[in-house]
């Protein structure tokens, strides 16, 4: 995918989203798989929703899904302990399930029969979601943690890594309401998430391999840091 280098300087989030949507929409009318990556609280879901809306406004069919629908059961997620950074990084998500019911069906050789989600982490139960059929032109917009892990990296045609320091993302994530954690980055309960994300950043180096890296520290003024694709 040939994409010109971005201009320097911050831009509004709408401008950045539109820039990416224009590049994706300019590709041949075949299915694309797009991953929106970043640490907890950086703003992945909102960015992915906005990108999906921008593509729909350009006449594209969008499949919108998230890693939140593919957690492992609690017994797997916490088997190294509820505060384990290693457990958070290694065991939060069921990658074979994600591959089987969503990613593999949407590849060029896939059946196009997929499910948006397969597990409800709030109830700790599988979701009996109805199978859907994607058109050949549908674009998958998928947000979640750890999307540049080896298990997933080969599926994406284009990725965005939203970057911001933990001093910003931890209180931002906590501001979503009760149940979203302590706003203090130094709180013991946040060590699991911060250190788990650091394991991912060190092992998979998403800043170096993502198609686009965006400084998302200021939600009103996003800056395209690198355009690697």
Question: What positions do the PLM features span?
Answer:
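ATP-dependent NMP and nucleoside kinases share a basic, alpha-helical "lid"
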Residues: 125-179
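Post-Walker A helix-loop "phosphate-sensing" segment adjacent to the P-loop in P-loop NTPases
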Residues: 53-63
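The conserved Walker
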Residues: 40
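Conserved nucleotide-sensing/catalytic segment adjacent to the nucleotide-binding pocket
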Residues: 63, 72-123
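NTP-dependent small-molecule kinase module
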Residues: 1-27, 154, 158, 167, ...
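Conserved lysine of the Walker
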Residues: 44
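Hydrophobic positions on the alpha1 helix immediately C-terminal to the Walker A/P-loop
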Residues: 47
